[in-house]
Amino acid sequence: MILFYFMQTPLYYVHKHLKAKFTNFAGWTMPLQYTSIIEEVRAVRXRAGVFDISHMGRLLIEDPEKKLQYFTTNNLDKLSVGKVQYNLLPNEKGGIKDDVTVYMLSEIEFFLCVNAANRQKVINWLSPHLKLRDLSGELVQIALQGPKSEEIISKFYPVSDLKYYRFKVFDKTIISRTGYTGEDGFEIYVSPEEGKELFLELVKLAKPCGLGARDVLRIEAGLPLYGNELSEEITPIEVNLEKFVDFSKEFIGKEAMLKKKVKKKLFGLELTEKGIPRKGYRVFKGDREIGWISSGTYSPTLNKGIALCFVDIEERKEGNEVEIEVRGRRVRGVLRKYPFVRTPAGRYQK
């Protein structure tokens, strides 16, 4: 008999107290929802929501010789102390080992936030070449997202002057103006003890939200998820992330990335009939299969089914009428550019 053990974040019993419903994700037991996914999505869009995202990996890297530059697609020379950069860790084939955010703590110190499922893979990939310390167990990570997030976080920390993709350090706490929802927001890295207290204070002012709402929000915002839109086989070019790849510098897999013949690229899809698109559903133009869905959901904001999908390059046209196959039947839709939801804080995107 094989037993599977799922890890719990330091806030697990806080979530139990708040009557969260749990799910297993990337080896972790995480809140899926507290009330309903729809309510939580609407709370973030209209006011603010708070998420425990402590399952993410947090790595500290010392890099006096600037070796990290070769392991990233974006140019670390564009960073300065106090800035955050969205980045990709490429493999030898030009695919993606992980997508990460890089915080420049000092001229030689970098703090990386990596995906939960890829934490050990990234450690194994980088540690033979760089001095690396895994801080994942020493910090909790809380995301406060929504148009009222600045007003709320300012009750606890003086960060109202913080620009997007910037961060401040308060003792051992890091606060960045970053997020994964398309809304304005902050991510807080803090000790487990302080994190429990902070989370309980934040849920008095913002709605606690689970991974269900987080996934809907990121699809509405057109943001990729590793394992769906990103993988070791998919290049940044195929997911329209070229702006995060500096081809003027050297990095692992650069030549392979440029040589790969791209036949399909990521695009958006909205259903014009009732239905919910899901990962793996096929996309058709007439009788011809032109692609597949990588992520799909019902959008409470738009009141319709939406999806991210890989489709033939020549079919990537706004308003192109298509169909998806849902349990043996065809459902009509149209191709759309993403993000699907454009908020006043639309600049708050990766």
From Swiss-Prot:
Its EC number is 2.1.2.10. GO terms for biological process: glycine decarboxylation via glycine cleavage system. One of its GO terms (cellular component) is cytosol. It catalyses: N(6)-[(R)-S(8)-aminomethyldihydrolipoyl]-L-lysyl-[protein] + (6S)-5,6,7,8-tetrahydrofolate = N(6)-[(R)-dihydrolipoyl]-L-lysyl-[protein] + (6R)-5,10-methylene-5,6,7,8-tetrahydrofolate + NH4(+). Keywords: Aminotransferase, Transferase. It comes from the Bacteria. It holds the Pfam family GCV_T_C. It is an enzyme of class 2 (transferase). SUPFAM superfamilies: Aminomethyltransferase beta-barrel domain, Folate-binding domain. GO terms for molecular function: aminomethyltransferase activity; transaminase activity. InterPro entries: GCS_T, GCS_T_bac, GCST_C, GCV_T_N, GcvT/YgfZ/DmdA, GcvT/YgfZ_C, TrmE/GcvT_dom1. The glycine cleavage system catalyzes the degradation of glycine. The glycine cleavage system is composed of four proteins: P, T, L and H. This is Aminomethyltransferase. It comes from Aquifex aeolicus (strain VF5). The lineage of its organism: Bacteria, Pseudomonadati, Aquificota, Aquificia, Aquificales. The gene is gcvT.
